[in-house]
Amino acid sequence: MLFEQIAANKRRTWFLLVAFFALLALIGAAAGYLWMNSPLGGVIIAFIIGLIYAITMIFQSTEVVMSMNGARQVSEQEAPELYHIVQDMAMVAQIPMPRVYIVEDDSPNAFATGSNPENAAVAATTGLLRLMNREELEGVIGHEVSHIRNYDIRISTIAVALASAITMISSVAGRMMWYGGGRRRNDRDDDSGLGLLMLVFSLIAIILAPLAATLVQLAISRQREFLADASSVELTRNPQGMIRALQKLDNSEPMHRHVDDASAALYISDPKKKGGLQKLFYTHPPISERVERLRKM
């Protein structure tokens, strides 16, 4: 059951990434049609923009992310239990030892960052270290180490980059349509039914693509959380420790320090504790659903 869940989550992620590239091609074709009457040219430009966005974000420094979250690097002497658990989980996962950081905050939480295992880091809040026993802490750190081993940060970064590129192209295409599109449309002989259909299709794509991209990005993030939960159990062989940790995280207060939206997606549990309609656009699946999946293992 465990390995079936891991395989299923990986398949869903790849399916969603294909959907992302299809969306990028769609918005590129729509913008290309409106700008230069060349859908193929628009697709090529869209993929170049998406590639630039992805490369730029992937190589963002780990230190920058840690600094944004107020994390400080600690040694084995400063945080021996946390350090040894990270060391043990990295050894079982067969990845290099990540750097270890602590965030001064009473709310229990943790996150990992780094585009590959060689430059990765794991951070835990002081609240997490106080609240969790060793088995629960192993579950949380196993989750974060699994994100590193599974290259989740890179996949999530690509998803964010593609969503940003789609939103940017859509925004620029919309402005071009209103401020210069009329002249372009008059320059083309688009009075035919096909031309009108293409125009309507392009407008719909420009309007709806950013929303669709956001939903796909969130779906990818949720699948990677399920995968990290299952992978943590693979490392620790202790589903109950992970379940208890998630339940404690679910009952905790929001983090006291400010966490921006991009960083919030990295944490094991929503640091802002969103409610109401905001949950529709949350990067994490409900903890109750995560616990239910772990219980089925």
UniProtKB/Swiss-Prot annotation:
Carries keyword Hydrolase?
yes
Tell me which PANTHER family the record gives: PROTEASE HTPX (PTHR43221:SF1)
Loss of function: phenotype: No effect on extracellular glucosyltransferase activity, nor on growth characteristics. Deletion does however alter cell surface appearance, making cells rougher at 41.5 degrees Celsius. They are also slightly less adhesive on hydroxyapatite.
Against Gene3D superfamilies, the record matches this protein to:
Metalloproteases ('zincins'), catalytic domain
Q: Does the keyword Nucleus apply?
A: no
List the GO molecular function terms: metalloendopeptidase activity; zinc ion binding
Name a single GO biological process. proteolysis
Q: Which UniProt keywords apply?
A: Cell membrane, Hydrolase, Membrane, Metal-binding, Metalloprotease, Protease, Transmembrane, Transmembrane helix, Zinc
Entry EC number(s): 3.4.24.-
Which residue ranges run through the membrane? 14-34, 39-59, 158-178, 196-216
| Pfam families assigned | Peptidase_M48
Show the taxonomic lineage.
Answer: Bacteria, Bacillati, Bacillota, Bacilli, Lactobacillales
The protein's name is Protease HtpX homolog
Recount the UniProt induction comment for this entry.
Answer: Expression is maximal during the early to mid-log stage of growth and decreases after. Does not respond to heat shock up to 43 degrees Celsius. Part of the lemA-htpX operon.
Cofactor needs: Zn(2+)
